[in-house]
């Protein structure tokens, strides 16, 4: 049986964690990015399909390639973030299933149904983006996930000639708490959940 994590860990991962829009000028090392992936990859996905592919943008050149795709409200926070992750999904993720899910012919489930393949890739890469956020928080980093961008521009700028398609962006770094907005409410259990 698993042990519950400490109240402090729950605060770090959930109740005290915030979406950041401003960043301290503290770099995020490539080794830390590897640690993030080393944690997030263990999050469950359907048939272990693991469709997410991540591009960590760390350079000014990379940010300039990304700039035209950003909405005005996301521009400054992204250009000043130490790292921006493009979380994409591989439209041919099923080609790795003989390795990732050797228990049966899972590849054929998706090659026979392009719609199922796309739905599975998008849904599961979205889950993996959430795992990335939790991994960042566990390592003492802050994040700012965003969907306000031109996906086609990102795909053209970063994924031309590949099987990858962008899902969302996540800014990563050490947040400047002085630039946080007031904490917004969340729905109560009664508003969001049901018991049957």
From Swiss-Prot:
<dbReference type="GO" id="GO:0035527">
    <property type="term" value="F:3-hydroxypropionate dehydrogenase (NADP+) activity"/>
</dbReference>
<dbReference type="InterPro" id="IPR050461">
    <property type="entry name" value="Nitroreductase_HadB/RutE"/>
</dbReference>
<dbReference type="Pfam" id="PF00881">
    <property type="entry name" value="Nitroreductase"/>
</dbReference>
<protein>
    <recommendedName>
        <fullName>Probable malonic semialdehyde reductase RutE</fullName>
        <ecNumber>1.1.1.298</ecNumber>
    </recommendedName>
</protein>
<keyword id="KW-0520">NAD</keyword>
<keyword id="KW-0560">Oxidoreductase</keyword>
<keyword id="KW-0288">FMN</keyword>
<dbReference type="InterPro" id="IPR000415">
    <property type="entry name" value="Nitroreductase-like"/>
</dbReference>
<keyword id="KW-0521">NADP</keyword>
<keyword id="KW-0285">Flavoprotein</keyword>
<dbReference type="InterPro" id="IPR023936">
    <property type="entry name" value="RutE-like"/>
</dbReference>
<dbReference type="GO" id="GO:0006212">
    <property type="term" value="P:uracil catabolic process"/>
</dbReference>
<comment type="similarity">
    <text>Belongs to the nitroreductase family. HadB/RutE subfamily.</text>
</comment>
<dbReference type="GO" id="GO:0019740">
    <property type="term" value="P:nitrogen utilization"/>
</dbReference>
<comment type="function">
    <text>May reduce toxic product malonic semialdehyde to 3-hydroxypropionic acid, which is excreted.</text>
</comment>
<dbReference type="InterPro" id="IPR029479">
    <property type="entry name" value="Nitroreductase"/>
</dbReference>
């Amino acid at each position: 049986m698993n042990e519950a994590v400490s109240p402090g860990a729950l605060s770090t991962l959930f109740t005290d964690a915030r979406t950041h829009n401003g960043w301290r000028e503290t770099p995020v090392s490539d080794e830390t990015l590897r640690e993030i992936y080393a944690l997030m990859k263990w999050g469950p996905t359907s048939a272990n399909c693991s469709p997410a592919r991540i591009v960590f943008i760390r350079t000014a050149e990379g940010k300039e390639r990304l700039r035209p795709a950003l909405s005005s409200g996301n521009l400054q926070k992204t250009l000043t973030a130490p790292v921006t992750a493009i979380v994409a999904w591989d439209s041919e993720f099923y080609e790795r299933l003989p390795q990732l899910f050797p228990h049966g012919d899972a590849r054929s489930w998706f090659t026979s149904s392009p719609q199922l393949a796309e739905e599975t890739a998008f849904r599961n890469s979205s889950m993996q983006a959430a795992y990335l956020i939790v991994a960042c928080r566990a390592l003492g980093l802050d994040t700012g996930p965003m969907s306000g961008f031109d996906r086609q521009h990102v795909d053209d700028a970063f994924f031309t000639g590949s099987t990858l398609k962008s899902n969302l962006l996540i800014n990563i770094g050490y947040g400047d708490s002085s630039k946080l907005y007031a904490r917004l409410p969340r729905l109560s259990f009664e508003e969001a959940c049901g018991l049957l």
